[in-house]
């Protein structure tokens, strides 16, 4: 969702790199966000894609504790508010497996009355709403803005085959299952920027490309997320069944 190949130093068509299992992509020894080095700060490993989204690829000693606390907040929002139900259904890795619920709520409308029903995971219908907006303002030649032009969402969903029995519907009875998402475009955009930024560092090194305002955007100091993050507003291609995610 990031026009990143065109933004960072004019680099396009980044080579595809495949990782399997827990992998160190690069050893940095400096905070990639604020610049603190190992002499000044306790540095932690930084996942390119959040661990909560299934990633095991990381930059070693790449974030100070203060910056890690900032990135953790928007990554938790993405993992819980946007991908939360999807992660539970798919059994995506978590650092707190004992806290994973055995039931999830569904938002149901029957005969004009809306209510919530707790369902076991195998009976639970869910939605995944991925925010999307227009191409980055930088690529469109417009001034930085806090607006998200064309903001909408790609909506994916799963309805189990036994939904009639799960909702205890009688023959001919119709139920409307409604999305129940609260994704925030700013936090989602910062998470996408962080993935793109870390991926560029993995490929080119910390000093191998022009950062522009990306570190400040990721840390929340540059408020114009849509100036550097965006997408072509079109239907996404079919997912690659051979991998969990693709960064390009």
Regions found by a protein language model. Give the residues of each.
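Alpha-helical structural context detector biased toward long hydrophobic helices
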Residues: 7, 11-13, 17-29, 38, ...
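Extreme N-terminal basic, low-complexity initiation segments
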Residues: 2-6
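Short recognition patches in nucleic-acid-associated and regulatory proteins
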Residues: 39-52
């Amino acid at each position: 969702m990031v026009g990143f190949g065109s933004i960072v130093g004019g680099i396009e068509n980044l080579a595809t790199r495949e990782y399997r299992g827990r992998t160190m992509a690069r050893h940095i020894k400096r905070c990639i966000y604020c610049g603190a080095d190992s002499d000044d700060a306790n540095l932690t490993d930084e996942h390119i894609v959040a661990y909560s989204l299934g990633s095991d690829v990381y930059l070693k000693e790449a974030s100070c504790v203060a910056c890690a606390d900032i990135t953790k907040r928007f990554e938790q929002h993405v993992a819980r508010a946007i991908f939360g139900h999807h992660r539970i259904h798919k059994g995506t890795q978590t650092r707190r497996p004992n806290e994973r619920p055995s039931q999830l709520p569904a938002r149901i409308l029957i005969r004009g009355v809306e209510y919530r029903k707790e369902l076991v995971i195998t009976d639970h219908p869910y939605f995944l709403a991925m925010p999307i907006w227009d191409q980055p303002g930088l690529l469109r030649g417009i001034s930085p803005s806090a607006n998200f032009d064309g903001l909408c969402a790609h909506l994916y969903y799963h309805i189990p085959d036994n939904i009639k029995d799960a909702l205890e519907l009688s023959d001919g009875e119709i139920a409307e299952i409604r999305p129940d998402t609260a994704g925030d475009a700013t936090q989602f955009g910062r998470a996408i920027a962080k993935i793109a930024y870390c991926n560029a560092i993995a490929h080119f090194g910390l000093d191998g490309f022009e950062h522009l305002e990306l570190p400040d955007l990721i840390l929340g100091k540059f408020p114009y997320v849509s100036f550097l993050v965006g997408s072509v507003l079109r239907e996404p291609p079919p997912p690659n069944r051979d991998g969990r995610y693709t960064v390009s």
